[in-house]
Amino acid sequence: GIITLVDAINAENTYNNHKEAIKQTALADKIILSKTDLSESSNINSIKNRIKKINPKANIIESNKKNLPLTELIGLNDYDPLNNSWDSRKWLAIEKYNETTNKNTHHNHNHEHEHHDINRHGDNIESFSLVTNQQISMTTLNFFIELLSSQMGSKLLRLKGILNIKGKDGPAIIHGVQHIFHPVEWLKEWPDEDKSTRMVFITRDVKKSIIEDFFKIIGKN
């Protein structure tokens, strides 16, 4: 897992002037927000909101010179699909990519649809989820991953997905960070009754519409 340290005093200035800091936040599994004892609560809340827009799933841990909760740094690796006790829904955390947006009407239909873009704050980072109820062929999946890797490269900061593949009883699990993708893993069975394909994305300097166009390939095959 990845830990990123964010200075509560200088965070806004750092984010505004250093794109690399935004990237590091987007890739993090946990954020240590330091010097919270030296910052106003309103400033801390503002920073936390900005962090959540950049990376909805990352846990934010407040710390100060008197308190660094070391126990929070244990168990950072939440990607372990071969472990029988691994919770794929908690790992995907798709609800966190939707909770800070305006509620959109949800329609029960059988084609791909968008599940909210929660980033509109000028950091050039977009975090969103996409869902389709159609099954996907392995050929389509491999092509989709290759397309994302070759066309997006380092601009695809993170991708996680639970996918319904034709001819398979359990879902496929995909996980990519920039142009590097883990091998596709398979679960023996679905964790619940929802067998839709669900993916969450964090991108930089890439319009969501481009990913949506790639995603439509899945719905057509």
Residue locations for each model-derived region?
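Structural motif
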Residues: I3-L5, I32, I202
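Conserved Switch II/interswitch segment of TRAFAC-class P-loop GTPases
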Residues: G1-N16, T36-S42
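C-terminal accessory "lid"/substrate-recognition subdomains
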Residues: K23, L27-K30, T36-E193, T197, ...
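Flexible active-site lid/hinge loop adjacent to a nucleotide/diphosphate
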Residues: A8-L27, I31
